[in-house]
A protein has these predicted regions:
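Inter-helical turn/loop segments and adjacent helix faces that build the functional surface
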Residues: 8-19, 41-49, 101-104, 127-147, ...
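Alpha-helical bundle segments that constitute or directly flank the non-heme di-iron/ferroxidase center
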Residues: 4-10, 26-33, 107-132, 154-158
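Eukaryotic endomembrane system proteins
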Residues: 50-132
């Protein structure tokens, strides 16, 4: 998942979901440390590998495909807060309503992209680790990855639950975005 999951918390109105986001954030920290542990055991100088990740155009492009919608939501949320549009909401201001709806559209797209990340992209990247484990190679790393996959499956269930609740009308303003097709969520 995304380590910045906590940035969605101010836009969460359910204490149960906020607690869930806190646990999710903790899991992501553990995942990050687990990946670091694996890298330190595979490479004699893992710093070289870590440094090249941020310079590899293919990796950066793949990451931006997933995180683009998320970044747009976070940036818009900050702008919404700083512009004080939220203070106008109670007055029924036309502009504040448009801003709020646009923010919710971006939140929907961000959650849909995280859903795709958790449900598809991570499992594709785990395939090699699982194969090594089946061949009795790097079994410790394969076990770590299987625990991470278990957590990612929980994150998938969370995002699917959020999307399904929106689709069912949990938030009338958000339900209108649930007709978007998966490929449209990356805009």
């Amino acid at each position: 998942g995304l380590g910045d999951v906590y940035k969605r918390q101010p836009y969460c109105s359910l204490p149960e979901l906020e607690a869930c986001m806190n646990v999710w954030q903790m899991m992501e920290m553990i995942h990050s440390r687990s990946y670091t542990y694996i890298m330190k055991n595979v490479y004699s100088n893992p710093s070289e590998v870590f440094d090249t990740i941020l310079e590899d155009d293919r990796i950066l492009e793949r990451a931006s495909n997933v995180t683009g919608a998320y970044d747009k939501f976070v940036n818009s949320a900050h702008q919404y807060d700083q512009s004080n549009w939220w203070r106008e909401d109670w007055k029924g201001s036309y502009n504040s309503e448009l801003e709020r709806k646009e923010l919710k559209r971006k939140l929907y797209r961000a959650v849909a992209n995280v859903n795709i990340l958790e449900g598809i992209r991570f499992y594709v990247s785990f395939a090699c680790s699982f194969a090594f484990g089946e061949l009795k190679l790097m079994e410790g790393s394969a076990k770590i990855i299987s625990l991470i996959a278990r957590d990612e499956n929980q994150h998938l269930a969370i995002t699917q639950n959020i999307l399904n609740n929106w689709r069912k009308g949990d938030d009338p303003e958000t339900v209108s975005y649930t007709h978007l097709r998966a490929h449209e969520t990356s805009e």
